[in-house]
């Protein structure tokens, strides 16, 4: 059983929901990410999603795009992100870490670091670093069968996005290859946009669960404890990204970790 699966299993037995914060690796300071990850765990995070900066992030809203641009300007690429996970793992061997990003940096990493037709350098190095799951926004499920199998061989999960526009056929395709959890994007459009319609989310989840047997996390548009609590009543996990980025983007270095921790404590208290 993967670390993600055992985390969800433990939470389910306690009747609790997973809190999954997202931060862009290397933001707002190049070297702050491992410390920020530890502070989010202290605030109640069950799984951490780490965004891999990319120059053309089609699914990200302006807040996360801007964070990615800053991280890229600070020299953060996939190799640096894996090093951050290694550093985090020196003190935390239990909290699952998911890398969220796009196909291009993964493919470039494989070319640069000696991937072959039978082995992906990215998968090898991610497993060694202590990564638990991968969410590649622009990898369609029908093209991911082999990638998913290679990840599973290293005890890593392949996580997919589902949207309000996802058809039953698409959900069935995702169910074939997804493991760990699926991430339901509760708004049409890009991350951090608009307000959340909890009733619409609640109506959609039974449809998703007909097809998908892994836990369902809901994100995009969750900004406060009240919304998190409402979503937590219907979903297995609450994912929060843009709001955390906004809270930390203008903080002095010594305040970043505490601001993130204190915000997550509020969300955790509401979920529990």
UniProtKB/Swiss-Prot annotation:
Q: Which InterPro entries match?
A: Aldolase_TIM, RibuloseP-bd_barrel, Trp_synthase_suA
Residues the record marks as active site: 49 (proton acceptor), 60 (proton acceptor)
Give me the reactions it catalyses. Answer: (1S,2R)-1-C-(indol-3-yl)glycerol 3-phosphate + L-serine = D-glyceraldehyde 3-phosphate + L-tryptophan + H2O
**The UniProt record lists the keyword Amino-acid biosynthesis:** yes
**What's its EC?**
4.2.1.20
Task: Provide a Gene Ontology MF annotation, just one.
Answer: tryptophan synthase activity
The pathway this protein participates in, as annotated, is:
Amino-acid biosynthesis; L-tryptophan biosynthesis; L-tryptophan from chorismate: step 5/5
Q: Which UniProt keywords apply?
A: Amino-acid biosynthesis, Aromatic amino acid biosynthesis, Lyase, Tryptophan biosynthesis
So what family is this one in? Belongs to the TrpA family.
Protein purpose: The alpha subunit is responsible for the aldol cleavage of indoleglycerol phosphate to indole and glyceraldehyde 3-phosphate.
Q: How does it assemble?
A: Tetramer of two alpha and two beta chains.
| HAMAP family membership | Trp_synth_alpha
The record's section on PANTHER family has: TRYPTOPHAN SYNTHASE ALPHA CHAIN, CHLOROPLASTIC, TRYPTOPHAN SYNTHASE, ALPHA CHAIN
Q: What is this protein called?
A: Tryptophan synthase alpha chain
Instruction: Look up and give the organism this protein is from.
Output: Polaromonas sp. (strain JS666 / ATCC BAA-500)
